[in-house]
Every structure is written in C-alpha cells, then in structure tokens.
Amino acid sequence: MTDQAEKKHSAFWGVMVIAGTVIGGGMFALPVDLAGAWFFWGAFILIIAWFSMLHSGLLLLEANLNYPVGSSFNTITKDLIGNTWNIISGITVAFVLYILTYAYISANGAIISETISMNLGYHANPRIVGICTAIFVASVLWISSLAASRITSLFLGLKIISFVIVFGSFFFLVDYSILRDATSSTAGTSYFPYIFMALPVCLASFGFHGNIPSLIICYGKRKDKLIKSVVFGSLLALVIYLFWLYCTMGNIPRESFKAIISSGGNVDSLVKSFLGTKQHGIIEFCLLVFSNLAVASSFFGVTLGLFDYLADLFKIDNSHGGRFKTVLLTFLPPALLYLIFPNGFIYGIGGAGLCATIWAVIIPAVLAIKARKKFPNQMFTVWGGNLIPAIVILFGITVILCWFGNVFNVLPKFG
C-alpha cells in the first residue's frame, strides 16, 4: 500500500470497525450476566475489563508494527515466541474466529427470519436465511476488505441511531429505586461476589483483537490512526455498554432477571421484558432494527479478521482469485457446521470464551515483552513499561479461573 493510499483513509473508519465488531449481539448478554452484580458493581467490572482489553489490544499492535504490513498472529507468534506457542495461538485464534463466525451465521438466520415473520407474516426458513446472509458477507469480502469496513461503519451508524431512539426514551424513564435495587426482596445483600461469574462475558464484550492486522492493512504503519482506532473504538463501546446497563437495570427490576435467566437468557426474553414495561410501536420496530444490525455488524467484523488471518496463514495473495480462495476457507467450515447444528449462537459464544482469554489477553502481553527485547528501537511502545503486560496477564489468569469456577459451579450464580 502506498503512502497516498494510507493517508486517504480517515481514522473514523478504524474506530467504526473496532466499535462495530465489539458492539454486537453479545451485548444483550451483559445485563443478564451482570444481574447478580447489578448496576454499580457491574459498571465497575466492565470498566476493568475495558481497560485490560484495550491495553492487550495496544500490546498486540505494538508487536505487530515491527513486521511487514499484512502480517498476522501466525507470523508474529512464530517469530517472537516459537513454533509451540505459534501452534497454540493458531489453534485458539482459528477456533475463536471460526466459532464466532458460525455463531453469527446462526444468530443472523434466527433474527432475520423472526423479523420477517413479525412484519410480513411469512415464515422464512432460518437455515436458508443464515446461508444467504453468509453468501452476502462473503461476496463483500471478496470485493475488498475496505468495502466490508465501510458496510460495518454504515451498520454501526444505523445501529447507534436505532439504539438512541429506543433507549433515549427509556433513559428518561429510569426508576432510581430499581437502579439501586431498593425495592427488591434481596435489597441490601452483597453484590460483589457476582462480579466474578460475569468476568468472562465482560472480556468477550471487548473482543476486537482479530481486526488489528486488518487495520494495519488499511492504514499501513500510521500509528496515530491505528492507536486512535483502537482507543476510541473500544471507548465508544464502553460508553454504549454503560448506557445500555443504565437503561436496562433502571427499567427492569433485578428480580425480573431471574425469569429471563431461567428462560435461557436469550435476546428475545430481554426484549420482551423491555417491551412489557413501556411498549410502543416505534420502540418495538427500533428494537428489531437494533438487534438485527447489532449481529450484522459483528458478523462483518469477525469475518474480516478471520479472512485476513487465513490469508496470512496460508500465504494467499490479494488477487481476485486469491481472495476467492480465502473466502471459501473463511465461510465453508462454519456454514457447513451451521447446516448441521443451526441453533448454536449461545453455545458458540460461550465456547469461544476460554480460547479468547489465551490469544486476546495473555499472548499479546507476551508478544509485546518479547518484541521489546528483539526490537529495542521499535516505532511504538505502550506506556507503563512491563507493568501493563503484567496487569493484562493477571487479568487473563483471573478470567480463566472464573471461567472454570463457572463451569464447576464454584462461583455463586444469580437466579
């Protein structure tokens, strides 16, 4: 990429790619998983997760900038920490991105078919809808990564508009007695123990790391634009998440979340609880628009990261023929899995959590430490010396322990 090509892309697109990837269908799980900790402790642990994931992303960017444009996890890990860690990293990256691609194909099929049914009265087969959605996204990626980035930006913009319309009205209807849990039968109990069960979900809510190599392809080594993209994209996501928690936990009583959790904690349960409080036609419509766009923008972001990762892994060129091969590698495995197991959104998101902790938290910190030794005059170094990588690694270990604590029912669960 020439300097002229790099300069013409505004940092705005990078911010939208990061935020569009992060702010997706998974955000509907946040108020459900944070119901035990409730608003104030939930906001606290969400900010901790954002701080840690932001810096793990910057550490990954730091290591990546020492290598040629287009280099991905495979190239960097093999050079800095050896083939064994490269294999571990490769397995976790591929698993997370593939399983998320599968999950979003599943979610798109379910949400779009439900929207068609509610508005047109026509029952569309979710499998057909999901596959058609995958074909559309694959076609865009085949054209160019920049086209995918711009569509993600468009979806994010529309998503924010629908979000503001829906929750702007609920913002002014927040009941502070509900937000403080003052009227609940559990009022006055300890909320702190429930933050640990929510940590893995909070981590997954800031999973933008697969898009960093794609940003470098777009911007080259313009570190100012890259840093702005990561910082402001993740910060935008944090602000929207906090606003989202404020509106949900200020309108839906904490006790009501027990019923949502018992019904599986799916998107439709939370939306129905919202509509049950103050239902309006325009609000219902915008909720449907928002839920569709939330999943669609994350779908584009995740597949863009997987596409670039596979192109680097198999050294496939950027020609139309090469991009077509990469598209097939990106979409065929998750599409086939979706045809066999069409309803795996929640299982897919949950299964990706542990691996995401390894490759999106621990490995970036290790890569940055190794890169500082190998490239003492590198162009970008995250502030704080070795303290920041240490904090990030500690956060990752804590999340892993909490994940296993959830699996083996060691941690307290709400509902």
UniProtKB/Swiss-Prot annotation:
One of its GO terms (cellular component) is plasma membrane. GO terms for molecular function: aromatic amino acid transmembrane transporter activity. Residues 1-11, 55-86, 149-153, 213-229, 308-326, 370-387 are cytoplasmic. The chain crosses the membrane at residues 12-32, 34-54, 87-107, 128-148, 154-174, 192-212, 230-250, 287-307, 327-347, 349-369, 388-408. The keyword Flavoprotein does not apply. It is found in: Cell inner membrane. Keywords: Amino-acid transport, Cell inner membrane, Cell membrane, Membrane, Transmembrane, Transmembrane helix, Transport, Tryptophan catabolism. Gene3D superfamilies: Amino acid/polyamine transporter I (1.20.1740.10). Disulfide bonds: none annotated. This is Low affinity tryptophan permease. The keyword Aminoacyl-tRNA synthetase does not apply. It holds the Pfam family Trp_Tyr_perm.
